[in-house]
């Protein structure tokens, strides 16, 4: 998979510090207790917890409906037309496929001459939480 592991803090009540491939429902089932994502931790408790991380070196704008001239457009799903500047993480609307393609797509765009990356909304459920987390860190 293209995303790193889920990071869980077990030093007190279990909480997810960084969402990954294994989601909170699966973790809750194994631990036999509710485990939720917590973005409130100010201390860096594990690798990959920096506020800015995974950045391609190009400004990134999230939750956009379109991209302009000289801007790459990262999209998700079936409603987007295949244009020169459009990079679909998953035309099948598969979050697993999107997660696998995320870093490859960011590297591909980085090697082109785009001035900015615009990202269409990605569902904020399941693996979409991890994708949005990495995009948010890359955009800072």
Placement of each model-derived feature along the sequence:
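Active-site-adjacent structural elements in enzyme catalytic cores
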Residues: 1-140
